[in-house]
């Protein structure tokens, strides 16, 4: 087969034959889209320190030549392609004419966001049947993971329906076999880990590993005696004193009786309210074999609910309960999980399973990111355009049909790029949350990250502008005369609502009032409205005529102008929420006045203003905001990206899903080791993996201010941004089992957190982790299996120890299988120490497996085709230069 290379910088190509016939029928387009084999390879990173080179191979297996010049191929990139040619010199916009690759006759264009296109010029040379060609082009920064290349590229031709290129639906990214591919720069210290390296990271020297009784660890356990057991396999009666829902939680899982009076012959479980307990979420649990009873008390129904969850955890180990007394209460009032359903949508069922797990592990806040640039996900009565248009991503030649494809969503609405919760579905979510004792916090991101709302309201404007101008402009979100140019971190040029027009606040008032009504109808009152506030482009609004009319006394640079307008916007939104009796929350940069300090909190009338402190990449110098905001009176939610962003990979491996702008990887151990009460103690490595210390970063109180008002640390939260979450399985994989480590730290303060000596603290933390990992592997993962959660199964470690191959996993108790041919799998001892072997870990229920890795006993440090990095080592912060999300 003849191969012709289209090279960006090389002016050599073979003319195979010029065919100028167009793609004229849908059959032609379908045939090419179904049979054009596309493969993407990273050639190298750190080209000139700022670029990576990409090779795209096209292999035409269609019966028709890919020729003519009336077609386009759309693809996705998190970074600007050919930035020196497509990006303006000031970086504020992309050139509308794109860039034609020299001597290739393909034009590259930035459409918007991460959507790009390539199209032939009139000089394009066709790609005949059964021919293969390659093009090479550059893109900004780096690509070190397969998920850096979203799937579902698609083709269009004039007047025809767009069609996904079938070969890009699945695995179309080549292997990463060189450090030039998986390192961002030469200074990058991260490599994928071999099974041998992983084995030594999993390995523990602790000879006294013990399972934790309950996760999260209770505050106090006394009178524990494993020789005194209470058998609950027979007649058991629950006496619940009006705590019907809490009693039902037990009977849903076990065939126990519910009675108004105690049984005289069997075992009794007593549930009751005890007002003497200090914490509203605190509880006591007593297992008394001699009295043949279990007693659970709480100050509130919520406290009893958590006591029941602890009992269910004990019962999962069998019918014999050890004698013990538990006195427990949470470390923080706010123990949250954030879910971005805008970038990629997840169903109500997925959220309900998530809440089941949150309840099991005593997490109590579900922060739902319902609107962003890529999608609007909640029905609002009277604003049908928000869901008719803003909830859909598709390819359309007409305005007002849908949002443009993003993040691999493809040309139609069949993928996770489209979807929304109806009013009834949202009420159902709220009702389920109430049952799980979880507060739902809705977020509508403004003033930035609002493209979905803007596009929807512009469609509404066009619909009514010729018949009812008042109705047309009522909810409009932009100033049509604003000529400001900007490009956001996510490459959008039109995503900021205008803070200087009254219709913006009419829109927000409408959304807040409708959300509040839904919460009230569901019996789940709205308490906190999250307005977003993050990542507003620096030059948004600088040329807005409407903002000029407000007569602000602007001074300084464009960032100062933006901050003044953000301040105005934030006050207006706070006033709206205050009139509805709500508290307000936002991302920390939404309140940022500059120099790490927030806007004056006295400007807000709300009882509480919550700030999510996320931006703690140590070298960036913004970790100080968390304590500065708390000292200024804000209620701070520790949301730090280096430890609590679950959209980041578990390991520094090209095979692992996720973004990596804040840290190359975040495994369960890293989240487990987070110290929210001692933020600067978490300082570990530079953006490229070199060790750093607190002393090196915290050279002054300006860089690392002290915390003077610790009571203003409201709690902590895990986060799943969904740029790479394309399925339900992706969702569970990224959240679990990291959520368990989050719950442990949010509920329980470990003794090692108070230890000043770093060596002693590390030793104590490792022992605590060993016990936690033992419990997760031998108990908790099976519980997750039982409720249908497909957590990540970690790949195994392996080591040739003096001729004996030893295997382990990060969570002890999971079975490991081996194979000589990657087809027939066995368990047991590996006898052959001379040949390469395939390895995989099984889930606790035995139904699923980890990624397959290869191990060469002869070298014991061989690199694998699917390498991994995991726990015990604190993987760390990585500069992705404000890529996609915080």
Question: What do the predicted segments below correspond to?
Answer:
Residues 89-144:
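Intrinsically disordered, low-complexity Pro/Gly/Ser/Thr-rich segments with frequent PxxP/GP/PP motifs
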Residues 149-330, 584-596, 605, 788-789, ...:
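Acidic, contiguous N-terminal accessory segments
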Residues 288-507, 512-530, 721:
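Feature activates predominantly on carbohydrate-active enzymes
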Residues 488, 492-608, 616-621:
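Active-site neighborhood of glycoside hydrolase catalytic domains
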């Amino acid at each position: 087969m003849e191969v012709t290379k289209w090279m960006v910088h090389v002016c050599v190509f073979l003319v195979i034959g010029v065919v100028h016939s167009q793609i004229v029928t849908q059959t032609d387009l379908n045939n090419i889209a179904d049979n054009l084999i596309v493969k993407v390879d990273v050639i190298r990173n750190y080209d000139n320190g700022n670029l990576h080179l990409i090779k795209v191979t096209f292999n035409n297996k269609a019966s028709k030549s890919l020729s003519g010049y009336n077609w386009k191929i759309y693809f996705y990139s998190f970074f600007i392609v050919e930035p020196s040619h497509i990006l303006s010199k000031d970086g504020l916009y992309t050139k509308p004419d794109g860039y034609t690759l020299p001597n290739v006759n393909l034009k590259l264009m930035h459409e918007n966001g991460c959507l790009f296109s390539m199209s032939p010029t009139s000089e394009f040379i066709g790609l005949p049947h059964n021919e293969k060609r390659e093009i090479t082009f550059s893109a900004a920064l780096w690509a070190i993971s397969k998920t850096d290349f979203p799937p579902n590229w698609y083709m269009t031709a004039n007047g025809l329906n767009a069609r996904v290129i079938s070969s890009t639906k699945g695995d179309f990214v080549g292997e990463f076999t060189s450090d030039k591919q998986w390192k961002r720069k030469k200074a990058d210290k991260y490599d994928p880990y071999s099974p041998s390296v992983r084995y030594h990271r999993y390995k523990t020297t602790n000879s006294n590993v013990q399972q934790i009784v309950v996760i999260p660890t209770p505050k106090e356990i006394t009178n524990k005696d494993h020789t005194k057991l209470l058998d609950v396999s027979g007649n058991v009666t629950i006496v619940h004193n009006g705590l019907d829902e809490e009693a039902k939680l037990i009977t849903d899982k076990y065939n126990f009786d519910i009675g108004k009076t105690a049984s005289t012959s069997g075992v009794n479980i007593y549930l009751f309210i005890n007002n003497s307990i200090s914490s509203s979420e605190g509880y006591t649990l007593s297992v008394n074999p001699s009295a043949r009873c279990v007693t659970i008390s709480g100050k509130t129904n919520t406290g009893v609910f958590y006591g029941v969850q602890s009992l269910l955890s004990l019962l999962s180990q069998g019918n014999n309960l050890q004698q013990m007394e538990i006195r427990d209460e949470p470390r923080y009032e706010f123990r949250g999980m954030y879910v971005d359903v805008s970038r990629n949508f997840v169903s109500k069922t997925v959220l309900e399973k998530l809440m089941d797990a949150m309840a099991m592990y005593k997490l109590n806040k579900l922060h739902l990111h319902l609107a962003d640039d890529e999608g609007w996900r909640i029905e609002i009565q009277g604003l049908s355009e928000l869901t008719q248009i803003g909830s859909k991503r598709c390819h359309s030649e007409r305005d007002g049909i849908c949002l443009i494809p993003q993040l691999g969503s493809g040309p139609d609405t069949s993928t996770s790029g489209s979807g929304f919760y109806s009013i009834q579905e949202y009420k159902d979510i709220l009702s389920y949350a109430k049952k799980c004792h979880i507060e739902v916090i809705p977020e509508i991101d403004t003033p930035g990250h609002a493209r979905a709302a803007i596009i929807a309201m512009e469609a509404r404007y066009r619909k009514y502008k010729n018949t009812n101008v008042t109705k047309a402009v009522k909810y409009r979100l932009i100033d049509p005369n604003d000529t400001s140019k900007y490009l956001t971190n996510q490459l959008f040029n039109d995503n900021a609502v205008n803070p200087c027009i009254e219709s913006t606040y009419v829109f927000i008032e409408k959304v807040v009032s409708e959300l509040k009504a839904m919460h009230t109808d569901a019996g789940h009152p709205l308490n906190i409205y999250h307005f977003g506030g993050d990542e507003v482009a620096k030059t948004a609004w600088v040329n807005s005529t409407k903002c000029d009319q407000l007569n602000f006394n602007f001074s300084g640079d464009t960032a100062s102008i933006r901050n003044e307008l953000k301040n105005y916007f934030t006050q207006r939104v706070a006033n709206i929420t205050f009139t509805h009796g709500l508290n307000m929350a936002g991302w920390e940069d939404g309140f940022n006045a500059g120099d790490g300090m927030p806007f004056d909190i006295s400007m807000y009338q709300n009882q509480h203003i919550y700030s999510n402190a996320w931006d703690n990449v140590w070298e960036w110098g913004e970790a100080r905001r968390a304590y500065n905001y708390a000292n200024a009176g804000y209620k701070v939610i520790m949301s730090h990206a280096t430890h609590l962003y679950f959209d980041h990979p578990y390991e520094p491996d090209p095979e692992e899903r996720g973004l990596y702008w804040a840290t190359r990887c975040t495994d369960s151990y890293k989240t487990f080791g987070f110290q929210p009460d001692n933020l600067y103690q978490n300082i570990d490595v530079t953006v490229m993996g070199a060790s750093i210390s607190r002393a090196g970063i915290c050279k002054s109180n300006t860089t690392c201010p002290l915390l003077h008002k610790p009571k203003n640390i409201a709690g902590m939260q895990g986060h799943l941004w969904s740029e790479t979450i394309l399925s339900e399985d992706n969702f569970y994989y990224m959240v679990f089992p990291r959520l368990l480590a989050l719950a442990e730290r949010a509920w329980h303060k470990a003794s090692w957190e108070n230890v000043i000596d770093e060596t002693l603290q590390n030793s104590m933390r490792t022992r605590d982790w060993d016990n936690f990992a033992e419990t997760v592997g031998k108990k908790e993962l099976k519980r997750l299996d039982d409720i249908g959660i497909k957590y990540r199964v970690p790949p195994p470690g392996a080591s040739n120890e003096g001729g004996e191959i030893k295997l382990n996993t990060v969570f002890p108790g999971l079975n490991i299988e081996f194979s000589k041919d990657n087809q027939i799998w066995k368990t047991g001892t590996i006898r052959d120490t001379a040949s390469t072997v395939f390895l995989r870990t099984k889930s606790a229920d035995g139904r699923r497996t980890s990624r397959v890795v290869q191990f060469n006993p002869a070298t014991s440090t061989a690199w694998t085709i699917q390498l991994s990095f995991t726990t015990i080592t604190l993987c760390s912060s990585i500069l992705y230069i404000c890529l996609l999300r915080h």
